[in-house]
């Protein structure tokens, strides 16, 4: 039987299409676009409360007059209609998501590609994004290509896409596919940070250990092990988890913004994934190295020297994704098996 792709409603942690939650999340989205919608939201809640009060009065009172009974009846009908709209929102969200996949030709991913996206699943889960497709948020169909009327499924706004493109350009120098490829090769060469960690651990390991443990608790033997080249591996672990996570996240974002094509994004994502599953024994092993790597990079490689308070904030920021994911996530991506460590990176 063919697998049907179905993910969370964007903006929700739940995989079930909870009509009330979707109804509320759409209200929040509309309020961001138009502050006046806040009055509509609270007006809706207020009318529901008043309707409940009228219905309660009708049930508990022994002698409502005719006008009171009519008011209570209308209030009850109003509540039924509102409940119907809320339930409908859940069904409509599911229908729209399925239609979106069909219209765009999006199919369930192979296990290998799911294993690749699992590497950044904690970040996507924290931000309530999609986890089983390359695009992490629905992208508005091009004019004329999909005439279906979407009412519940939230799309990336032009403003958000513009800000992400600006961020990729400012932080990573990505303007087109050529500059994207140059950055990916820079990561794979180790020159972004992995080689610096290796050199520093060879020259002054005690200093590196002291710097890292100023903001977090990484056992000294663990940090030393990351610098040692194990037999049968293409390299030492170094801070490769952080580097590879950046590669996958940047590739996904560049595709989401329309900067690069899907095929190119998957090419580098799968290169990163194969290296990750060759070097690390489990998801926990990968995420631990990732946290250490992000912290090290911000201490020793970032173009601007950060204060201790900023470094501590960076570490807490990166750590929260895995903590939240490991405690709360019930998404299918959580159950994807770790890739075979025997698969060599090439």
From Swiss-Prot:
Location of this chain's protein in the cell: Cell inner membrane
| UniProt-listed Pfam families | DUF1266
Spans traversing the lipid bilayer: 39-59, 69-89, 235-255
Entry keywords, A to Z: Cell inner membrane, Cell membrane, Membrane, Transmembrane, Transmembrane helix
What does the entry list under GO cellular component?
plasma membrane
Chain ranges on the Periplasmic side, renumbered to this chain: 1-38, 90-234
Bilayer topology reads: Multi-pass membrane protein
Q: Which residues lie on this side of the membrane: Cytoplasmic?
A: 60-68, 256-346
| Protein name stated in the entry | Inner membrane protein YnjI
Q: Which organism is it from?
A: Escherichia coli (strain K12)
Give the classification, highest ranks.
Bacteria, Pseudomonadati, Pseudomonadota, Gammaproteobacteria, Enterobacterales
Q: Which gene encodes it?
A: ynjI
């Amino acid at each position: 039987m063919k697998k049907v792709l179905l993910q969370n409603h964007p903006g929700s942690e739940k995989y079930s299409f909870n009509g009330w939650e979707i109804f509320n999340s759409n209200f929040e989205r509309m309020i961001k676009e138009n502050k006046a919608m806040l009055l509509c939201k609270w007006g809706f809640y207020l009318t529901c409360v008043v309707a409940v009060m009228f219905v309660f009065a009708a049930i508990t009172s022994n002698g409502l007059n005719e006008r009171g009974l009519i008011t209570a009846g209308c209030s009850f009908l109003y509540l039924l209609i509102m409940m119907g709209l809320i339930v409908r929102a859940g069904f409509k969200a599911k229908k729209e998501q399925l239609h979106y996949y069909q219209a765009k030709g999006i199919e369930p991913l192979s296990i290998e590609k799911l294993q690749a996206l699992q590497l950044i699943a904690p970040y996507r889960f924290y931000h309530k994004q999609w986890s089983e497709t390359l695009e992490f948020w629905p992208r508005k169909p091009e004019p004329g290509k999909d005439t279906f009327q979407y009412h519940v499924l939230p799309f990336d706004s032009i403003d958000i896409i513009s800000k992400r493109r600006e961020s990729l350009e400012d932080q990573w120098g990505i303007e087109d596919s050529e500059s994207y490829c140059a950055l990916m090769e820079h990561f794979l060469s180790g020159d972004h940070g992995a080689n610096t960690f290796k050199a520093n651990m060879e020259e002054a390991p005690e200093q590196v250990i002291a710097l890292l443990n100023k903001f977090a608790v990484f056992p000294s033997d663990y940090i030393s092990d990351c610098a040692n080249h194990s037999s049968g591996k293409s390299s030492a672990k170094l801070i490769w988890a952080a580097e590879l996570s950046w590669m996958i996240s940047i590739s996904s974002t560049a595709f989401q913004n329309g900067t690069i094509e899907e095929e190119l994004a998957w090419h580098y994502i799968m290169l990163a994934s194969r290296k990750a599953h060759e070097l690390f024994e489990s998801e926990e092993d990968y995420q631990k190295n990732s946290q250490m790597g992000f912290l090290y990079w911000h201490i020793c490689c970032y173009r601007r020297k950060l204060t201790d308070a900023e470094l501590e904030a960076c570490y807490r920021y990166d750590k929260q994704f895995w903590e939240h994911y490991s405690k709360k996530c019930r998404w299918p991506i959580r159950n994807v098996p770790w890739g075979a460590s025997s698969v060599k990176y090439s």
